[in-house]
Amino acid sequence: MSKINLLLLCGGGSAEHDISLMSANYFETSLAKSEQFSVLRVELDKFGQYRTAAGDDCELTNSREIRFRDESKTPWPVDYVIPCIHGYPGETGDIQSYFNLIQLPYFGCESEASSNCFNKITAKMWFSALGIPNTPYIFLNQFDDAAIEQTQTALAQWGSIFVKAASQGSSVGCYKVDDSAKVAGVLKDAFGYAPYVIVEKTIKARELEVAVYEYNGEVVATVPGEIICDTNTFYTFDEKYAKNSKARTDVVAQHVSAEISEQIRAYAIKAFKGMKLRHLSRIDFFLTADNEILLNEINTFPGSTPISMFPKMLQNHGHDFTEYLSLVINGQLTAKS
């Protein structure tokens, strides 16, 4: 039986480029445990150039093959691609549109679902339309005096706010604001990351995460895990990935009642199905001291670094990551044929 030529595409043009490379390491190791796949790892650099792990310049062509700049090398036909790219152009839905155009099967959420979830404003509109509670917010479309005034009003009303670039991940372009004197500077910084900015009420709550994925044709939601940070901070980019991070993760959140856990899982599945997600996601919630559940955000290609929650929660649920990938890939290719 011939092997499946699988392109593992990683990197990308966002601030999460290096995190994508770390996630690709996990995918590469997991795929190597199966004899079904012939894997070619290709990095998409920040300038849009493709390069193999061996350092060969190349490109993905419309005929679904990797063609090398060195013409003495034989083009490599691609059967399937895993776009292990956090942020642009992976989680934004851009590269999925290209795969659709050239009819190349790929792992993960489709273009529209990726785009809807990546834009925090669009996502919150979807959450509300689906009847899933989420944090109070306003959104801004330009940096001007009116935006500063609106944000000042929100801060006065809510006491503490988060200002977030609408289209970034891993807490990039995200700022906690308690002092009105800092509003203008923070807004300017946030607009430097994205053309739209969302301002949310700060919620004093536990941060719970659920891995939601498709397994043997069923949508699975794990029990919630938890991100535990210093009480005076939030889960910043540095807290997530720094070697000296004080944050810790619990694969199973402690002291969460069965009733609350089931409600969180129900909301997670409702969001997954309602927003037409596919294959995998990590869905993040807040749980307040009064047991109020608020959907925070959806990650359509969750990290798979050594500290990432998605693969840990999947395995804790009793599923092997390599087997999971094999089921998804083979199921998709069989359906296509």
Curated annotation (Swiss-Prot):
EC number(s) reported in the record: 6.3.2.4
Cofactor: Mg(2+); Mn(2+)
Protein origin, superkingdom: Bacteria
Binding site residues for Mg(2+) 2: 297, 299
Enzyme class: ligase
A GO CC term assigned to this protein in UniProt: cytosol
Keyword hit for Cytoplasm: yes
Gene giving rise to this polypeptide: ddl
Positions that bind Mg(2+) 1: 284, 297
One Gene Ontology term of the molecular function aspect: D-alanine-D-alanine ligase activity
Cofactor note: Binds 2 magnesium or manganese ions per subunit.
NCBIfam families to which the protein is assigned, alphabetical: D_ala_D_alaTIGR (TIGR01205), PRK01966.1-3 (NF002527), PRK01966.1-4 (NF002528)
The protein's annotated pathway: Cell wall biogenesis; peptidoglycan biosynthesis
Family that this chain belongs to: Belongs to the D-alanine--D-alanine ligase family.
Protein name as it appears in the record: D-alanine--D-alanine ligase
Catalysis: reaction(s): 2 D-alanine + ATP = D-alanyl-D-alanine + ADP + phosphate + H(+)
